[in-house]
Design a protein with these regions (language model features):
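PP2C/PPM-type serine/threonine phosphatase catalytic domain
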Residues: 1-133
Length: 133
């Protein structure tokens, strides 16, 4: 059984929280993005990354992929989100420099696949032990 949770906190140094998440448990999809603090529009970037990937997965579910193409598909989702963020930054000067980190996973049976951008990390909690992936 897979159990997940999400808790977000702005931390001690930030004025705002720039985290975004998306979970689709029935599809085994979990995404967390953290807008880069100190840059313009971090919250916008994290929200865009999560929504772009969520839409891609809703339109073209991962479960329909062959096992040997899953990681490539996850990579293409992250790349599409990155391109969308870059275009938004070009279109609107107030967004110049906006950025986000992201980690996502797809869990299918006893296998888990991960993709990330930046320094966001994934962890597994098993048998009372938290381990970085």
């Amino acid at each position: 059984m897979t159990r997940v949770g999400f808790k977000s906190h702005k931390g001690m140094k930030r004025e705002s929280n720039e985290d975004s998440c998306f979970i689709l448990p029935q599809e085994g999809v979990f995404i967390v993005a953290d807008g880069v603090g100190g840059h313009n529009s971090g919250q916008t970037a994290s929200g865009m990354a999560v929504s772009e990937i969520a839409e891609m997965i809703k339109q073209k579910p991962i479960r329909k992929r062959k096992e040997n193409s899953i990681l490539k598909y996850l990579e293409s989702c992250v790349e599409a989100a990155n391109i969308r963020i870059i275009h938004r930054a070009i279109e609107a000067p107030e967004n110049v420099g906006m950025a986000t980190t992201l980690v996502m996973s797809y869990i299918n049976g006893n296998k888990a696949y991960f993709a990330n951008a930046g320094d966001s990390r994934a962890y597994i909690f098993r048998d009372g032990e938290l381990r970085q992936i």
